[in-house]
């Protein structure tokens, strides 16, 4: 059994989701969102984000983490803020002793829904099928759960291929 922490980093609202994976079976453990105050200084927002993710790691003791690869936005300021938030989240994982697997957004969607072009509604609908009864905190938490599920699926496939 493996506990996986999925992460969808953002400065305004970072989603997180924890699943338990055993072979091809997955189970929902917990999920949530870390919101930061847009009016606060960026250093305070990043500190809050780091502390919150560190608390999630301490509470759920995952075996590994997974995050979406960064994408380049048309707005350089938005890309910079995303990179800063992502760095904070990855640093919290490293401080907690977690390896972080990174996956492209299209690969996450393909692994969970079956098509890399799936929209957020399709991902959320599939989460309801894969984890019936799970109360998902919001769109960012749903994305984080999808990242964790994709990581579990990709690891299962890799294990099947190895001799």
From Swiss-Prot:
Cofactor entry: Mg(2+)
First-listed, main subcellular location of the protein, grouped into a coarse class: cytoplasm
Annotated InterPro entries: RNaseH-like_sf, RNaseH_sf, X-over_junc_endoDNase_Mg_BS, X-over_junc_endoDNase_RuvC
Cytoplasm found in the keyword field: yes
Name of the protein in question: Crossover junction endodeoxyribonuclease RuvC
Family to which the UniProt record says this protein belongs: Belongs to the RuvC family.
Note describing how the cofactor binds: Binds 2 Mg(2+) ion per subunit.
Biological processes, Gene Ontology terms: DNA recombination; DNA repair
An example molecular function term from Gene Ontology annotations: crossover junction DNA endonuclease activity
Protein residues bound to Mg(2+) 2: 68
Pfam families: RuvC (PF02075)
Catalytic residues (UniProt): 8, 68, 140
Top-rank lineage group of the source organism: Bacteria
Catalytic activity: Endonucleolytic cleavage at a junction such as a reciprocal single-stranded crossover between two homologous DNA duplexes (Holliday junction)
UniProt-listed NCBIfam families: ruvC
Subunit relationships: Homodimer which binds Holliday junction (HJ) DNA. The HJ becomes 2-fold symmetrical on binding to RuvC with unstacked arms; it has a different conformation from HJ DNA in complex with RuvA. In the full resolvosome a probable DNA-RuvA(4)-RuvB(12)-RuvC(2) complex forms which resolves the HJ.
Keywords: Cytoplasm, DNA damage, DNA recombination, DNA repair, DNA-binding, Endonuclease, Hydrolase, Magnesium, Metal-binding, Nuclease
Keyword field contains DNA repair: yes
Described purpose of this protein according to its UniProt entry: The RuvA-RuvB-RuvC complex processes Holliday junction (HJ) DNA during genetic recombination and DNA repair. Endonuclease that resolves HJ intermediates. Cleaves cruciform DNA by making single-stranded nicks across the HJ at symmetrical positions within the homologous arms, yielding a 5'-phosphate and a 3'-hydroxyl group; requires a central core of homology in the junction. The consensus cleavage sequence is 5'-(A/T)TT(C/G)-3'. Cleavage occurs on the 3'-side of the TT dinucleotide at the point of strand exchange.
Gene Ontology CC: cytoplasm; Holliday junction resolvase complex
Residues where Mg(2+) 1 binds: 8, 140
């Amino acid at each position: 059994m493996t506990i996986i922490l999925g992460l969808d980093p953002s400065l305004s609202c970072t989603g997180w989701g924890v699943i338990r994976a055993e072979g091809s079976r997955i189970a929902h453990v917990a999920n949530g969102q870390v919101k930061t105050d847009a009016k606060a200084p960026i250093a305070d927002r990043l500190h809050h984000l780091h502390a919150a993710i560190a608390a999630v790691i301490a509470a759920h003791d995952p075996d590994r983490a997974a995050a979406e690869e960064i994408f380049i936005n048309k707005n350089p300021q938005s890309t910079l803020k995303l990179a800063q938030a992502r760095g904070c989240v990855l640093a919290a994982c490293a401080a907690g002793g977690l390896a972080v697997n990174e996956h492209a957004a299209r690969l996450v969607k393909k692994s969970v829904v079956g098509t890399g072009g799936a929209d957020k509604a399709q991902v959320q609908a599939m989460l309801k099928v894969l984890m019936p009864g799970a109360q998902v905190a919001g769109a960012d938490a749903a994305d984080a759960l999808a990242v964790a599920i994709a990581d579990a699926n990709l690891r299962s496939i890799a294990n099947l291929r190895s001799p």
